[in-house]
């Protein structure tokens, strides 16, 4: 029997057994061999770095368990705060890297440098670099705790790479050194990337997210291209697609799926790019067939082939109709014979045979054509061509090269280790709860005996971060001391303020101010006095990007100070969760029962009319989706005018609460529904309806066709360039233009919407151009989900990695005192107006670091004339800039109300030109 006959027989056997297992599928658990740093298989010439402290700490000394030179690679520059120093390893060929090991500089006891955490970046072609992230989107990897020990970290998901860079991190200016090893195996299947439509969400009793969450390519217009993801990670899905082999992931994680209703063509088209010409024998696709929930095997597959990116598809496509036991609900691998066709690009169409197609892995059985020139060799190929059509897929069989070694054992994640870790965590949590209860009881006993003394002068400081919160309340004449108030030190008279030298010292002694600066290693400017005994940490209002409604009269938290003319706003309920569908911390206002229930009754929206377009943002317990509603005029429930032309869909934003949300999160979500139902203004997004009869809970609000104002303005040029240096000077008029009067019209609409919120005593707390939507004819509506979008993560300051605050838009009293009022919204409006006149070309205080912005808030508190203001935009007349400066007045009473701002922008602003 000749070789060709043997090959044909093998292919027939493979196709016949295709429904059982993935025969060509690799097991990532066995792909854990050391790749050559420690045993010097990787030569010194393939190890490089951004810099090194000296030749004795050069990159070649970064081998794990090696003591060459001074014992490790040490960068010349600081890794704090920019994190730009890196160590690079060139593997020369594509590898699947499943594990990394790190070590510090021990040098026989003379060294003490190591890196407590690091990031990874990798490349397959030397030009495009991707940052590695775990399955939950975290980039930072915990490193070493001492200079000698080796720490192994599993990479879940693994990465397919030729070049890998280690970026050490530090939380302060310090020396770091690193030794490393990579573990994995050669990536022999040759798949460089696959292109596919973005996976969708299936709504059953719970939401099943069938997206390719680890895809490392590009996503544009509902298409993923130029990367690899879950279809090539080696994880084969279970029979029940709602379950997963991975721990702590969402339902549907193992599968990427598409709904038949979203594809009028009746098929899903994918494209695969390989490193060189190959003769393809078969393709294996692991599919789900849980037909009781709508998942079906493909009805057939059609594949086309070509040898280069600019060439035409060759010959007739290979067609294969799938048979077998379609009634068996078990997941299976489907083998598609490819007849030995030679190509570097494949385009395959998978025909729908039911409501859903669900794939977990795609792999190919192929042989390299000997006369082909590799696309990845010692030198890098020309820039890859990314096809405009549907996605290529990556599924590979790996040939393991053990080099006489045994695979490295798993560093973490075994069931026994996880169980022990959980038990230890539970025990520690119980001990912590008991300790807190005893501590609280102890202080309550002390406070019950404390003198009820008060100050004549009020000082209130709130830092709006759950768990990192300061509350200092000193009110004249309270009937009883505030909760958890420490006894006043002896020697202070009961009705005299503590001896404070000046405002600067008072600020430096302010625990809230010190806490905001705690993440920086800069010493204080002066020795402030000891922290007063009455400065006691406690929890207060949590910050969110949503609206805050003041407490109704009748149950004030504390008596308002007599000298304060600004209406007193109640503290919000403490909600220790990172937002429901958006902001990292979310506060639901403390309202009497039924206080928000006086709006119109909520309207049940037909869930079936929503057609998903893209995900706008997400929070800990929910997401914000952009959807379309076809023929909205047919929905009688939408009883207010909708400016949608007949035959055109209506764009809506859908806030979705995940089924696994806590009870508190569900209550907060329903309370937000009630609050949103009260908002009826042409410049505020409106609640169109809700889906609360079953999970997932949804609220539907209107959305604007031109997206958010920040992106909209940044794509425009200023039409009138008479003002010297106006945004757009020196640039070719390539994009659309906008006039100065139209900018004023935009700002006037924002002021109008905020004027309406002020009449309800609502406080937005995150007013910015990213939270304004643009519709037809420059119609503006104020929204509230900008904080949930990763696009604007750089606009928010993280306090100890948890809460996020838009400090560049916040009034000084918000940053230092957590005091959010309509007057603080006026401050944010001034910054928003500055953004509008700058055409969103620059971030406010872009020349200042976050620390310096906080210090500038302190200068407003001290009021010694050293505070910094935003500069006048080039296109802004002096009269309008003076209005901005009034918005940034130190005293909140001196800031203009929104009614005055609206009147000026709508009627008088053009006269200031």
From Swiss-Prot:
Residues 1-18 form the signal peptide. Gene3D superfamilies: 2.60.120.1190, Galactose-binding domain-like, Phosphorylase Kinase, domain 1, Transferase(Phosphotransferase) domain 1. Expressed at low levels in most adult tissues and is highest in the brain, lung, placenta and kidney. Lower levels of expression are detected in melanocytes, heart, liver, skeletal muscle and pancreas. Abundant in breast carcinoma cell lines. In the colonic mucosa, expressed in epithelia but not in the connective tissue of the lamina propria. Inhibited by the multi-targeted cancer drugs imatinib and ponatinib. It is an enzyme of class 2 (transferase). Its EC number is 2.7.10.1. The keyword Electron transport does not apply. Residues 21-417 are extracellular. Pfam families: DDR1-2_DS-like, F5_F8_type_C, PK_Tyr_Ser-Thr. Changing residue 379 to A: Phosphorylates in response to collagen, but at lower levels compared to wild-type. Phosphorylates in response to collagen, but at lower levels compared to wild-type. Disulfide bonds join 31-185, 74-177, 303-348. The modification Phosphotyrosine is found at residues 484, 513, 520, 740, 792, 796-797. Keywords: ATP-binding, Calcium, Cell membrane, Disulfide bond, Glycoprotein, Kinase, Lactation, Membrane, Metal-binding, Nucleotide-binding, Phosphoprotein, Pregnancy, Receptor, Secreted, Signal, Transferase, Transmembrane, Transmembrane helix, Tyrosine-protein kinase. Ca(2+) 1 binds at residues 211, 230, 253, 255. The active site is at residue 766. The modification Phosphoserine is found at residue 631. It catalyses: L-tyrosyl-[protein] + ATP = O-phospho-L-tyrosyl-[protein] + ADP + H(+). Autophosphorylated in response to fibrillar collagen binding. GO terms for cellular component: extracellular exosome; extracellular space; plasma membrane; receptor complex. GO terms for biological process: axon development; branching involved in mammary gland duct morphogenesis; cell adhesion; cell population proliferation; cell surface receptor protein tyrosine kinase signaling pathway; collagen-activated tyrosine kinase receptor signaling pathway; ear development; embryo implantation. ATP binds at residues 616-624, 655. GO terms for molecular function: ATP binding; collagen binding; metal ion binding; protein tyrosine kinase collagen receptor activity; transmembrane receptor protein tyrosine kinase activity. Tyrosine kinase that functions as a cell surface receptor for fibrillar collagen and regulates cell attachment to the extracellular matrix, remodeling of the extracellular matrix, cell migration, differentiation, survival and cell proliferation. Collagen binding triggers a signaling pathway that involves SRC and leads to the activation of MAP kinases. Regulates remodeling of the extracellular matrix by up-regulation of the matrix metalloproteinases MMP2, MMP7 and MMP9, and thereby facilitates cell migration and wound healing. The Gly/Pro-rich domains may be required for an unusual geometry of interaction with ligand or substrates. This is Epithelial discoidin domain-containing receptor 1. It comes from Homo sapiens (Human). The gene is DDR1.
